[in-house]
């Protein structure tokens, strides 16, 4: 991670850390780095439903136009929609304005290259070097060489038509409950599933600029679970603010997380000869039960650091086509170049249709170990990881576990948090281990 770029682009409190002035520079320098070898380059921009999206979009557009780029605004669209359209529309770069599952005051800017993939560390470092220069020495075209802006609000429909083709039959006869987090999928997902002839119930589809992720979406699936039970739905599908995550709910109201969705997809893809190299790529946060279920089905796993960019890097390196995170980022690389909540949802419902099994049965083939994750707000993430007392309590707890479970303590990639996670044979043991570590972290580096 650099000074500006975290694990998922540039993030911060809009108009405080992520200011219009910074957004202008990111547009100008980012646009230059990604398009400098092209005459009259095309850059597309999408955003989620945050109130700050218009402000940052205007600044970004100005920065891009100042380099001579032609800018196409997509309006409100999901992150994977931008990734797909960057390549499909032959753009030199794509930009998404979103802070994903974060609260409304936050926002972020992430770039995609012409291939639809997120930027490499080297590209981000090149942009950061320009941001840190005292004098802007980039070319400043004038007159007819300046860029122009246009709108392509039909882009969302083009993207939906593409992902719709990935399923084998329609969803008639199924009742699907959708939670769109008052975010980027609010107008897209209901249209998609209705178009596939499903009976749908919806929530989180009334964005007002202020309510994105507020008590809804993939970080609050328990709310969708109530709707599933109330409506008697066959499945619930919860997306996050920018539509790159999926958390599901089975017909009984049980939450089905990213690990379980990955396992269901892996098993089906193996059975149908689609799973490349018989391997799934996951992160260190995946549940022990996930690995045991894969092992029982003779499927190999490959483990990375936390963050969908690291999963993607490993997938590209090894030629794998399925990967993801417990949080619901599922990457289906045969179809799209980033985590995609709606695409993952289509595949999950398609598997239900093709196997004629309810989601509870499909998910039930994986038994999760009890797990607890506690976020501790800290003054300094780096200091926390170097603190001797914190290192000592982790060592003591790991010794006591004696291999029957695991502890993971790591910094958040986007917030001033230390995440403390444990898995153990019982919830009681799990909770006790986590709280012992949390108390030491709070005492040593906790923020008020």
Curated annotation (Swiss-Prot):
<dbReference type="Pfam" id="PF02878">
    <property type="entry name" value="PGM_PMM_I"/>
</dbReference>
<dbReference type="GO" id="GO:0004615">
    <property type="term" value="F:phosphomannomutase activity"/>
</dbReference>
<dbReference type="InterPro" id="IPR006352">
    <property type="entry name" value="GlmM_bact"/>
</dbReference>
<dbReference type="InterPro" id="IPR016055">
    <property type="entry name" value="A-D-PHexomutase_a/b/a-I/II/III"/>
</dbReference>
<protein>
    <recommendedName>
        <fullName>Phosphoglucosamine mutase</fullName>
        <ecNumber>5.4.2.10</ecNumber>
    </recommendedName>
</protein>
<feature type="binding site" description="via phosphate group">
    <location>
        <position position="100"/>
    </location>
    <ligand>
        <name>Mg(2+)</name>
    </ligand>
</feature>
<dbReference type="InterPro" id="IPR005844">
    <property type="entry name" value="A-D-PHexomutase_a/b/a-I"/>
</dbReference>
<dbReference type="GO" id="GO:0005829">
    <property type="term" value="C:cytosol"/>
</dbReference>
<dbReference type="GO" id="GO:0006048">
    <property type="term" value="P:UDP-N-acetylglucosamine biosynthetic process"/>
</dbReference>
<comment type="function">
    <text>Catalyzes the conversion of glucosamine-6-phosphate to glucosamine-1-phosphate.</text>
</comment>
<keyword id="KW-0413">Isomerase</keyword>
<feature type="modified residue" description="Phosphoserine">
    <location>
        <position position="100"/>
    </location>
</feature>
<dbReference type="InterPro" id="IPR005841">
    <property type="entry name" value="Alpha-D-phosphohexomutase_SF"/>
</dbReference>
<dbReference type="InterPro" id="IPR005846">
    <property type="entry name" value="A-D-PHexomutase_a/b/a-III"/>
</dbReference>
<comment type="similarity">
    <text>Belongs to the phosphohexose mutase family.</text>
</comment>
<keyword id="KW-0597">Phosphoprotein</keyword>
<dbReference type="InterPro" id="IPR036900">
    <property type="entry name" value="A-D-PHexomutase_C_sf"/>
</dbReference>
<dbReference type="Pfam" id="PF00408">
    <property type="entry name" value="PGM_PMM_IV"/>
</dbReference>
<feature type="binding site">
    <location>
        <position position="240"/>
    </location>
    <ligand>
        <name>Mg(2+)</name>
    </ligand>
</feature>
<feature type="active site" description="Phosphoserine intermediate">
    <location>
        <position position="100"/>
    </location>
</feature>
<dbReference type="GO" id="GO:0009252">
    <property type="term" value="P:peptidoglycan biosynthetic process"/>
</dbReference>
<dbReference type="InterPro" id="IPR005843">
    <property type="entry name" value="A-D-PHexomutase_C"/>
</dbReference>
<feature type="binding site">
    <location>
        <position position="244"/>
    </location>
    <ligand>
        <name>Mg(2+)</name>
    </ligand>
</feature>
<dbReference type="GO" id="GO:0008966">
    <property type="term" value="F:phosphoglucosamine mutase activity"/>
</dbReference>
<keyword id="KW-0479">Metal-binding</keyword>
<dbReference type="Pfam" id="PF02880">
    <property type="entry name" value="PGM_PMM_III"/>
</dbReference>
<dbReference type="InterPro" id="IPR016066">
    <property type="entry name" value="A-D-PHexomutase_CS"/>
</dbReference>
<feature type="binding site">
    <location>
        <position position="242"/>
    </location>
    <ligand>
        <name>Mg(2+)</name>
    </ligand>
</feature>
<dbReference type="GO" id="GO:0005975">
    <property type="term" value="P:carbohydrate metabolic process"/>
</dbReference>
<dbReference type="GO" id="GO:0000287">
    <property type="term" value="F:magnesium ion binding"/>
</dbReference>
<dbReference type="Pfam" id="PF02879">
    <property type="entry name" value="PGM_PMM_II"/>
</dbReference>
<dbReference type="InterPro" id="IPR050060">
    <property type="entry name" value="Phosphoglucosamine_mutase"/>
</dbReference>
<keyword id="KW-0460">Magnesium</keyword>
<dbReference type="InterPro" id="IPR005845">
    <property type="entry name" value="A-D-PHexomutase_a/b/a-II"/>
</dbReference>
């Amino acid at each position: 991670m650099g000074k500006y770029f975290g694990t998922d682009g540039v993030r911060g409190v809009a108009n405080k850390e992520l200011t219009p002035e910074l957004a202008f520079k990111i547009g100008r320098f980012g646009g230059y780095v990604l398009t400098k070898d092209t005459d009259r380059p095309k850059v597309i921009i999408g955003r989620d439903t945050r109130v700050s999206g218009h402000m940052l979009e205007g600044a970004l557009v100005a920065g891009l136009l100042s380099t001579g780029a032609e800018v196409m605004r997509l309006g409100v669209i999901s992150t994977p929609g931008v990734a797909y359209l960057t390549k499909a529309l032959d753009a030199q770069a794509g930009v998404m304005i979103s802070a994903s599952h974060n609260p409304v005051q936050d926002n972020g800017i992430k770039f995609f290259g012409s291939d639809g993939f997120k930027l490499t560390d080297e590209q981000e470092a090149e942009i950061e070097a320009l941001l840190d220069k005292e004098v802007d020495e980039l070319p400043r075209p004038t007159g007819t060489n300046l860029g122009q802006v246009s709108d392509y609000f039909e882009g969302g429909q083009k993207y939906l038509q593409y992902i719709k083709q990935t399923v084998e039959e329609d969803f008639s006869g199924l009742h699907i409950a959708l939670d769109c987090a008052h975010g980027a999928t609010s107008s897209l997902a209901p249209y998609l599933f209705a178009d596939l002839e499903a009976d749908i119930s919806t929530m989180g589809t009334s964005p007002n600029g202020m309510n994105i992720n507020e008590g809804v979406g993939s970080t609050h699936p328990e709310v969708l679970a109530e709707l599933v039970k109330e409506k008697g739905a066959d499945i619930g599908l919860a997306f996050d603010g920018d539509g790159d995550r999926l958390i599901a709910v089975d017909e009984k109201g049980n939450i089905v997380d990213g690990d379980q969705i990955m396992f269901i997809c892996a098993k089906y893809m193996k059975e149908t000869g689609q799973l490349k190299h018989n391997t799934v790529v996951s992160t260190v946060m995946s549940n022990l039960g996930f690995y045991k279920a894969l092992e029982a089905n003779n499927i190999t796993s490959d483990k990375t650091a936390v963050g969908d960019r690291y999963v993607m890097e490993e997938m590209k390196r090894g030629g794998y086509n399925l990967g993801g995170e417990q949080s619901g980022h599922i990457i289906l690389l045969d179809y799209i170049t980033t985590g995609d909540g709606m695409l993952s949802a289509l595949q999950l419902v398609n598997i239900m249709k093709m196997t004629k099994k309810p989601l509870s049965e499909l998910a039930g083939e994986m038994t999760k170990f009890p797990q607890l994750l506690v976020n501790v707000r800290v003054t300094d993430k780096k200091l926390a990881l170097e603190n001797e007392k914190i290192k000592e309590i982790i060592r003591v707890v790991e010794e006591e576990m004696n291999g029957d479970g695991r502890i993971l303590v790591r910094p958040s990639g986007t917030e001033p948090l230390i995440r403390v996670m444990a898995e153990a044979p019982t919830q009681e043991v799990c909770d006790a281990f986590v709280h012992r570590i949390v108390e030491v972290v709070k005492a040593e580096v906790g923020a008020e």
